[in-house]
Each structure stands twice: as C-alpha cells, then as structure tokens.
Regions:
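Cofactor-cradling patches in redox/metallo enzymes
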Residues: 155-165, 170-254
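Iron-sulfur cluster-binding cysteine motifs and their immediate structural context
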Residues: 33, 42-73, 77-104
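Ferredoxin-type iron-sulfur electron-transfer modules and their immediate structural context
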Residues: 1-48, 52-55
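Flanking helices and flexible, charged tails adjoining ferredoxin-like Fe-S electron-transfer domains
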Residues: 1-19, 79-172, 178, 276-278, ...
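C-terminal functional extensions of proteins
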Residues: 227, 231-287
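Generic secondary-structure signature for well-ordered alpha-helical cores
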Residues: 50, 152, 204, 208, ...
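Fold-independent oxyanion-binding glycine-rich loops
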Residues: 35-36, 69, 90-92, 108, ...
C-alpha cells in the first residue's frame, strides 16, 4: 500500500483538462477539402475508399469531390493517394454533428442529398428530430444506456472515455443499466437484424424527452458492413438520431465532444468550420 500511495502522489492528477490537447503526429484525422482542383479524369481517392465515402461529382476538366464523413473510417488512403492535395488530413477531435447532412463535405451544398443517396441504402426514419429536445434539461447531467449492435471497438472507446485520463463523468455523463433510467440512448454497431427489435424496445422504454446518439461510422451509415444482408446500414434506419459521432472508432475526445453537444454545452461540427486555405494545410476554427 505505501508503494501504491507513493506512486499515485508522485504522478499527480492524470485527468486532462479541456480544451482537448493537440492530437499527436501519429494520430490519423479526418479528410478535409482544400481549394486545389482535382486533376482531369482522376478518381484515385474514390477508387481506394473502402466504404464508398467519396463521390466524384461531374467530370471533364474540373471534377468535384464530395466526402461523407458519416461513411468514412479514417483509413487515410484518400489523402495519401491524392496527387493534387485536394484532400488533406484534418487533425480535429470535434467531429460530432447534429445533422446527417452536416457530415458531408462538398462545395455545392445542394449536392448533399445526391451524396447521401449512396449511404441511404434503406429508407430512413423520417422525419427525424431536427434539434436536441430542450437541451437545457440535460445541461447538468445526462444518463445514457449503451446498446451495442455489433461493434466492440466503439464500446471500448466509450469505456476509455470514462478512465482517469478523459473522465467523461466530470461533465455529468453517467452510464446506466436500464433504459428506464436513461435520458440518452448510445448506439454502436451497424444495427444487425437481430438487434433491431431489442433496440426499438429499449428506445420505447425510455421516458420523454430523450436523445439518440449514433457512435461510430457503423452506427451512422453501416461502415464496412454497409449493404450486408444482416445490417440496417445505420441507426437512423431504425430510430431518429439526434447526434452523430463519426469515426472507426471515434477517439474518446470525439465521444466527449458528442456528449457535450448532446448536453448543449458545445457547438456541433459544421462543414463551414473548415477554412479552405491551400493544398498543403487546413485551418480549423475552435480547436
């Protein structure tokens, strides 16, 4: 015991304070678009994307790229293969959005439905809730029930967000065992057929008002399982979703950002957050 106490006192407080620290060099971020134009006829990025998250719009001399972050698994192949610097890496933890459309990066916002059509292989629950219901209710505490529908990686990151380094509970989040005690439903995985009915029953057992948070690319669009016979291709094919946290899996800081967005304490990710600069760098507001 004396050795343990000496170790703990010598290390001090392990919990990292907000704002989140600068991501390490070896941490892979999300794709981002720059002002650099694509080469004529080039579709290298779309060809290597394992989840069809990249759509080539138009063609000819000036093709345009659209990136669906809700389908992106952050493999890094697109910005590694891009010969013109049109796609670069954006090292940011703040990726949680309150709208599926906000996860689509494209210059012409009118093209967003066209891009999402690739991910929406099955009808979605519409209309979904446009905003988080009366978020002031949740600003001090949020009790969440986690339902895993086939993704242990995202479950592990949710667990990591509760460790002494990240300590998500200091912001008021508490994981509960019963949906009757929950304000929020955290969903991970592509929602397999066997889990659709239990998921709906869990949602039905929750009292109003309630929030649904899709954690991870699988829960948003199906991820690498998209189009599989046993996958619903995302949680919003079964339930209305309020907050989307992309990533495969998302970093604990990204999960914390999503939690704070759900509680009304932080602003969600928006496409206009990204300031286009040049082909070699990208600046992000509010890092």
């Amino acid at each position: 015991m004396p050795k343990l106490l000496n170790y703990l006192f010598s290390k001090g407080v392990s919990t990292v304070k907000l704002p989140a620290p600068v991501p390490p060099e070896d941490w892979r971020g999300i794709p981002a678009l720059t002002d650099a134009e694509c080469s004529s006829g080039c579709n290298d990025c779309a060809a290597v994307c394992p989840t069809d998250a990249i759509t080539m719009i138009g063609g000819g001399d000036k093709p345009e790229i659209a990136i669906d972050l809700g389908a992106c698994i952050q493999c890094g192949l697109c910005f590694a293969e891009c010969p013109t610097g049109t796609i670069v890496e954006n090292k940011t933890f703040r990726v949680a959005a309150t709208s599926r459309e906000d996860l689509v990066l494209v210059n012409d916002r009118a093209r967003v439905p066209e891009v999402l059509a690739k991910s929406n292989l099955v009808p979605k629950k519409t209309p979904g809730p446009p905003n988080i219901p009366d978020s002031k209710i949740f600003k001090d505490s949020l009790h969440a029930r986690v339902v895993s529908t086939g993704c242990s990686s995202c479950d592990a990151e949710i667990g990591a967000s509760s460790n002494p380094v990240f300590d998500v509970e200091r912001f008021g989040l508490h994981i509960v065992a019963s949906p009757r005690h929950a304000d929020a439903l955290f969903i991970t995985g592509p929602v397999s057929k066997a889990m659709q009915s239990p998921l709906e029953r869990c949602y039905g057992a929750m009292a109003e008002p309630k929030i649904v948070v899709a954690i991870g690319t699988c829960a948003i669009s199906g991820g690498v399982h998209k189009g599989g016979y046993a996958s619903a291709n995302g949680a919003d094919a079964v339930l209305p979703v309020n907050v989307y946290i992309p990533g495969c899996p998302p970093h604990p800081w990204s999960i914390i950002h999503g939690v704070l967005v759900a509680m009304g304490k932080m602003e969600p990710f928006k496409p206009e957050i990204q300031k286009k600069v040049d082909s070699k760098a990208i600046e992000v507001k509010s890092q």
